[in-house]
A protein has these predicted regions:
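Periplasmic/cell-envelope proteins involved in peptidoglycan metabolism and beta-lactam response
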Residues: 1-177, 184, 193, 266-274, ...
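Beta-lactam-recognizing serine transpeptidase/beta-lactamase-like catalytic domain environment
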Residues: 60, 156-192, 206-429, 445-446
Length: 446
């Protein structure tokens, strides 16, 4: 009897181990199946090391890339190819965040049940992106050979409409790797971080709104310089006495340095974190770069950090989401690049992308920031430069040192669209990056 009991216990133990192992295997298959299926050694979907299946389209059905056994076929228009390089990818798979790398599992048509069976997946292995190829071309033209990036998304749906990074190359033309500029194979809006310059004053403003009493009555007298710990923070010109609206619209470095010092490093750190600027967003499995900040205990460094300098570095997409949250009363959709995928010939195989949302601000704070950003345009940048957009914006001039001209930033929103634009070494923000933003937004909103 005892032998039977021992055997029964042993059998049950082995059965339990088998079930646990089976559950673990199914879990691994579900989570990693697409990666395993799209491995380079799979001759069923690769030819001579090149992906031989799958296609990428823009939101309107424009073909951007089609993989065949004879090689990768790109759109016939060279401008579209250059403008969408960082979203679509190159033949050498150099851009890790591009569709032909990041969405490879979807392009091979992998399904948990059917695998990559060609009978069931057929020719419908396609990824429909959220981007508008024509909007990307407008951004590419507006940058006019200058290095930088343009990103626009619908803050209500999360769909990224425009995502351009320069320098770029034509993926359909073979290039000598030694002639490719540094940074060509990096999607800067997703994978890089930059000194934000005065765009960061929107973070300091949010912190001041929620932590400084009687901010509506606060004023600051700008004499063109502000001394902290025996060192000067300067403005390009004397602004005189300004309230918080005037301080932001004039981008007064002295006023904002004083606010940052008064608020303190702990508060500034809290708001950089809370507003999503140190977070990594998940864009359909693509992890964005995390911003980094150092709100030093030395007041002079804290003052510079409060105006977007010192060691401040922000990821462009994170800043764009913050703009969306200001537009959306404190909340915004998380960005996405996939509009839908078709993995199979079976009915109902067309799957739409869904985006979550983030809550970054109170509705009251967002409302005040909206009013102030609208005032920036009306009193400084000029509505006539952005006709019909009812633009809310903030410019930034980010000093990068090494004797180079500063980076020009322009970020904000118009209607349902939040944006961030940077022209590297472009000089003053509104003058260099503003026209780029206008051209792209005019196209998207027409």
């Amino acid at each position: 009897m005892k032998k039977l009991e021992k055997r029964a216990i042993l059998c049950l133990t082995l059965a339990g181990v088998l079930i646990i192992g089976l559950i673990f295997f199914v879990y691994r298959l579900e989570t990693n199946g697409s990666k395993w299926a799209s491995f380079y050694a799979n001759k069923h979907i690769y030819t001579k090391g090149q992906l031989a299946v799958g296609a990428v389209y823009d939101r309107d059905g424009t073909l951007l890339l089609k993989n065949t056994k004879d090689g990768s076929q790109y759109n016939d228009d060279s401008e579209i190819r250059r403008a969408t390089l960082h979203v679509v990818g190159d033949k050498g798979f150099n851009i890790v965040t591009a569709a032909n790398n990041a969405f490879r599992g979807k392009m091979v048509g992998y399904n948990f049940v059917t695998g990559t069976n060609p009978i069931l997946t057929g020719s419908s292995r396609r990824v429909n992106l959220t981007i508008d190829a024509d909007a990307n071309v407008e951004a590419y033209r507006a940058l006019a050979g200058r290095n930088g990036f343009v990103s626009v998304y619908n803050w209500k749906t999360g769909e990224i409409i425009c995502l351009v990074s320069t320098p770029t190359v034509d993926p359909a033309v073979q290039v000598n790797s030694s002639s490719v500029q540094s940074g060509t194979y990096i999607n800067k809006a997703l994978s890089a971080k930059f000194t934000p310059g005065s765009t960061f004053k929107l973070v300091t403003t949010a912190a001041a709104i929620e932590n400084k009493e009687d901010l509506d009555k606060w004023t600051f007298k700008c004499t063109g310089s502000y001394v902290i710990d025996g060192e000067k923070i300067t403005c390009p010109k004397v602004h005189g006495t300004v309230d918080i609206y005037g301080a932001l619209s004039n981008s007064c470095n002295c006023a904002y340095a004083s606010l940052a010092v008064e608020l303190g490093g702990d508060v500034m750190t809290k708001y950089a974190d809370r507003l999503g600027l140190t977070a990594s967003y998940d864009v359909n499995g693509i992890k964005t770069a995390e911003g980094s900040f150092n709100f030093d205990t030395y007041d002079i460094n804290l003052g510079w950090a409060g105006i977007g300098q010192f060691e401040d570095e922000v990821n462009p997409l994170s800043m764009m989401v913050y703009m969306g949250a200001i537009a959306g009363g404190g909340k915004a959709a998380e960005p996405c690049l996939i509009k839908s995928t078709a993995k199979s010939l079976l009915p109902g195989s067309e799957r739409s992308a869904r985006s979550g949302s983030v809550s970054l601000l109170s509705s009251d704070t967002a409302s005040k920031l909206r009013d102030m950003m609208r005032n920036n345009v009306k009193s400084n940048y000029g509505d006539s430069n952005y006709p019909g957009l009812e633009l809310h914006a903030k410019s930034g001039t980010a000093e990068v040192g090494r004797g180079k001209a500063p980076h020009s930033w322009f970020c904000g929103f118009s209607g349902d669209y939040a944006f961030v634009v940077c022209v590297e070494n472009g000089g003053y923000g509104a003058q260099a990056a503003g026209p780029v933003a206008n051209r792209v937004l005019q196209h998207i909103t027409k």
